[in-house]
Amino acid sequence: MVKLGKKEQQKYRTEGYDLDFISRVQPQGGIKFNEKYIAQGDCYVACLHVYSLAEDIPPLWLTALMNNKDTISSVDVATANKEEVVKDINRSITELKDRMTSERRSTDRDDAHWELQNLTDFARSITQQGEIVKLVKLRIYIYDPVLEQLEKRIGDIKKEIAGQNYKAQVYVFKQKEEWQTLFASYDDQIEYLGVKSGYPLPSKNIGFGIPFHHQDLKDPRGIYLGQTSTGGAFILDPFFSTGTRTSFSGFIFGKMGAGKSTLLKQLEEGLVAKDCFIRGFDKARDYYTVVQQQGGKIIDLSGVQDSEEVETGMINPLEVFATKITNTGAVDEKGSFIQHISKVTNMIRFLNTEFDDTVIQEFRKHLYAFYIEWGLVPQKGSDRPYKVTGYPPNHYPILEDFYKYLSNLKLEAGATPQRHRDLEAIKLQVEDMITVYGDMFNGHTTLKNFENEQIVFFDIDGISKYDKSVFNCQLFTALTLIWSHALKNGRQMKYLREEKNLSIEDVKYFMVFLDECHNVINSQNEFANRYVLEFEREMRKFFAGIFFATQSPQEMLPPPGSTVDVSTMKAIFELTQYKIFLNMDNSVLETLKSVLGESLTESEFRILPELKRGEAIVQVSSTETYNVMFDPDEKQLERFKGGQ
């Protein structure tokens, strides 16, 4: 760095320079102007000069040019001399009229005619409608600590804006002047720096360009999660409804270590503070510390208690929970029972994949008849009210009771030998559930006052070590229980709201968290997929939502070329209101596009692999997308230990 002598310092001070101020703000390490870039002590800089604009300028066009990540943009605007503008237009009109008759190719004559019409309209707006013409200079200053990376970024930005019909270039041997324009007015640039006049534009085009916009999200009753790329607060309430935000579910994608679990815990902690009911599944045991500090419960569905911190409990697979509602918001008893029969049938199907449709039909028939004999379901033609949900746990049969029923069952006369074999196969399967997995399947529900607990997480690590079929059975049972709790809370809140006895601030919401959700929804778990999809559709009316998190769609989708139907999984994603994309690997982008469609722009897809840890593209609605840096404080990170 050059050090000035005393005489030089005195000279500059006499001329009015504040040398102390300059010393504080000057580039540390000095500055050197090279042919195509500027070298500073800590980075390299290049000025990309926009020298040609699109023929048809769209709304918000300046935003696209001046809101590039890690750049500084400048726009210089001056008012053009009206007489000179009109004179230039007249000259151009004369030239275009000549081209309309002299050009040999018809396409060139058509182009000249089109340009003439545009120019004539422009001239009329100036002379008759009071349009004011502005002169505009647009510059994008790109910086990077690595010269090669700077050159790559210049190429990327040029390619991006070229796709919108703008042209830009780094002016060779002009980098010093381009740097100085940052500190000079438009008139000084023209007079002292030898800069050419700006690009003429109607003032209305600048008006709807809106380049210097500021993004923030400040939901009433929201949770502070981080800051937007423009420094605005990002305060999100997933239960806040607007004209474009109509449901309460969300999806989080991001590779390992990108910040998925930390974000979910930020959200969970904020919702707990709002007195929201929380339910979730934890496979990696990431939530133990958080849930314990909040006074919640962790339940191991495997029936094995390997820690004092964890409760074990049985959920009776034959207990009927309320999972269906009518249009008035009441429990649909018959619909809930039919869905319950479907759930138990699928449990049997998963436990024995060799059962064909005939065996399954036989099982369903006997199960339905068993509930009639037990007294829960009225006989056909009976005028007895249909009531199967909401009874105490010991009011329901257990698998052992069903096995006794099957053992005493006599098929009607004339039943085929195949039906007898099917009945024996069903009895054998139920007996296996009782003897081998009795701790999980054979007994009344033992979780007391479970539905009134604010925070409950199911540890599915234990059951994930069992056969896939057993895992699915317990998973579906837990999902049914969660659905029942959400319905009960939602119906109460809905009734109080409709009776105007509860303000929106006092509503108690219900949120389900599915971290590492590929363990639950995937191409091999179609029943769970359909169950979760139905939950999404129904729960919106009852102040409930569900948040999913996984590394990429590849974790859930079948391999390329598979004939497995993935429409249900795509529907689950499409129904989510909030879509959050943390850093993702290049290799999954094509799969992501196949699932997302046009949810993100091409430029947003391209920056996903470049996002820093904790940084995300957040889509709140079809018209609202934010670039957010989530920033939990040190105390939160200490509480969130385990999972990032």
UniProtKB/Swiss-Prot annotation:
Entry-linked InterPro entries: P-loop_NTPase, T4SS_component
Which residues hold ATP? 254-261
Q: Name one GO molecular function term.
A: ATP binding
Q: Does the keyword Transport apply?
A: no
Record keyword Cell division present: no
Keyword annotations of the record = ATP-binding, Nucleotide-binding, Plasmid
Name of this protein:
Uncharacterized protein pXO2-09/BXB0008/GBAA_pXO2_0008
